[in-house]
Amino acid sequence: MHRKHLQEIPDLSSNVATSFTWGWDSSKTSELLSGMGVSALEKEEPDSENIPQELLSNLGHPESPPRKRLKSKGSDKDFVIVRRPKLNRENFPGVSWDSLPDELLLGIFSCLCLPELLKVSGVCKRWYRLASDESLWQTLDLTGKNLHPDVTGRLLSQGVIAFRCPRSFMDQPLAEHFSPFRVQHMDLSNSVIEVSTLHGILSQCSKLQNLSLEGLRLSDPIVNTLAKNSNLVRLNLSGCSGFSEFALQTLLSSCSRLDELNLSWCFDFTEKHVQVAVAHVSETITQLNLSGYRKNLQKSDLSTLVRRCPNLVHLDLSDSVMLKNDCFQEFFQLNYLQHLSLSRCYDIIPETLLELGEIPTLKTLQVFGIVPDGTLQLLKEALPHLQINCSHFTTIARPTIGNKKNQEIWGIKCRLTLQKPSCL
């Protein structure tokens, strides 16, 4: 078998004149395209082009110039543009996202978790406006996050009502100025926040009903700012420090609707702080925690408290070593008392605890550290109608009760959260 030699290609650098003529029968175009599974590009209206991503930022701006279409030169027979045919809406029935009313889109957005809501806010200006609607930002949980204070301020400006943010980090100063927040329930317990930053955030809050600042360092300006929230019902300042008895008096005198107050273990509390607390706490209070003041809480303070707050239901005076069994008569003056905590009040004689069993309304009694383990069972048998040493921790004014899986804040479940979101 003889191989056929390839024809030599002329050298372009030579002087030999060479010309090629390309030709195509336009009648065969449709046959070729059909074999390829495509069709020729149909003419479209100018406004039916797909909007490129880079123009999304211009949506909603009428002054934005329209795009110019390139005009082809020459006749249609010179070349053919081939691309996939545009989907015909008649063959794919449905409703365009652009035609959906705002109310329906808001309903869809309300089913999204926080990461997805942030994503859709970047689609276009309309979606950004809808994703920022205050109805979607009623409850927000950013527990344990490292946040810039300005970001926190912007989020609260969205219309957040319940803000759960314990154990968070906001160790930078607040730079921006914000309009008043609408937040009513806020938990910043055990967070790392600069005093000036905390003051900047709280200064924009005047509608608070429930607030927990447990473990934070405060200041007189912060406490005086809190006094603007006259609708406070629950206030947790357990373990706080940095404010005087004068600021405390201003706060308690202004918050006349308090129902639960936790002032336990405030590090730099003195006898004067305790005296101010019992003399100015709201008369409407039903749950009060004044534990941890050892020698600073006297029997006279208890007498003042009982006279001022006859509606107490839950009272915690644990770690008050100056209280003895001669103060028991004060508890009999509280006609609604159900829960009493006297743990580690070491001057109380264990045998005298039987007297407390005669309080008709009493249901639970916490006396850890007073009754030896050997006689605890005897006490329980002598007072069978009481639950004794049934709880190690207080729940007074605490925002979250139970295990760490509980993501509620005073019974309100936060919808927007970054804690393992379950997106649709």
UniProtKB/Swiss-Prot annotation:
Annotated region described as Mediates interaction with hepatitis C virus non-structural protein NS5A, given as residue ranges = 1-220
**What SUPFAM superfamilies does the annotation carry?**
F-box domain, RNI-like
Domain of life from the UniProt record: Eukaryota
Gene Ontology annotations of biological process type:
cellular response to cell-matrix adhesion; defense response to virus; G1/S transition of mitotic cell cycle; G2/M transition of mitotic cell cycle; innate immune response; positive regulation of double-strand break repair via homologous recombination; positive regulation of intracellular estrogen receptor signaling pathway; positive regulation of protein polyubiquitination
Q: Where is the F-box domain?
A: 94-140
> Which residues are modified to Phosphoserine?
64, 72, 75, 179
Q: Which parts of this chain are annotated as the region Disordered? A: 39-73
Please give the GO cellular component terms listed in this UniProt entry: cytosol; nucleolus; nucleoplasm; nucleus; SCF ubiquitin ligase complex
Indicate yes or no for the key word Membrane: no
Q: Which keywords appear in this protein's UniProt record, sorted alphabetically?
A: Acetylation, Antiviral defense, Cytoplasm, Host-virus interaction, Immunity, Innate immunity, Leucine-rich repeat, Nucleus, Phosphoprotein, Repeat, Ubl conjugation, Ubl conjugation pathway
User: For the motif Nuclear localization signal, what are the positions?
Assistant: 67-73
Listed transmembrane segments? none
Post-translational modification, as annotated: Phosphorylated on serine and threonine resudues in response to DNA damage, promoting 'Lys-63'-linked ubiquitination of NBN. Ubiquitinated by the APC/C complex, leading to its degradation by the proteasome. Deubiquitinated by USP13.
Q: Which spans of this chain does the record mark as coiled coil?
A: none
LRR repeats at which positions? 151-176, 177-204, 210-234, 235-257, 258-284, 286-308, 309-330, 334-356, 359-378, 380-401
Compartments where found = Cytoplasm; Nucleus
Main localization of the protein described in the UniProt heading:
cytoplasm
Please give the pathway this protein is involved in. Answer: Protein modification; protein ubiquitination
Classification via PANTHER family: PROTEIN ARABIDILLO 1 (PTHR46976:SF1)
Q: What functional role does this protein have? A: Substrate recognition component of a SCF (SKP1-CUL1-F-box protein) E3 ubiquitin-protein ligase complex which mediates the ubiquitination and subsequent proteasomal degradation of target proteins involved in cell cycle progression, signal transduction and transcription. Specifically recognizes phosphorylated CDKN1B/p27kip and is involved in regulation of G1/S transition. Degradation of CDKN1B/p27kip also requires CKS1. Recognizes target proteins ORC1, CDT1, RBL2, KMT2A/MLL1, CDK9, RAG2, NBN, FOXO1, UBP43, YTHDF2, and probably MYC, TOB1 and TAL1. Degradation of TAL1 also requires STUB1.
Name under which the protein is recorded: S-phase kinase-associated protein 2
Species of the source:
Homo sapiens (Human)
